[in-house]
């Protein structure tokens, strides 16, 4: 049989005793430090979780708005625009206010000759 060695570990705690108005308060500094670290840890984790949730919501909203924008101004609306432009409309021609301007006359003549 071999030698068995056992070790005992003693934990020493710093205990603070204070009295105020004839009341005794005993607190362990190790416990209070643990509580402070625990509160800081929980607050940090809470902030990280809140930021992650905000990031996910932002990404979802961004994807939704991008798809909506593509539908309104993208490929699907090009066919609608070409349909609207191919149909003749009686309200397309607007008479210019300044008819004596030669640039307006040339532009109107070039537009009328193209159609």
Swiss-Prot record:
It is found in: Host membrane. GO terms for cellular component: host cell membrane; membrane. It comes from the Viruses. Keywords: Host membrane, Membrane, Transmembrane, Transmembrane helix. The chain crosses the membrane at residues 39-59. The keyword Membrane applies. Coiled coil: none annotated. It is a single-pass membrane protein. Belongs to the rotavirus B NSP1-1 family. This is Non-structural protein 1, peptide 1. It comes from Rotavirus B (isolate RVB/Rat/United States/IDIR/1984/G1P[X]) (RV-B).
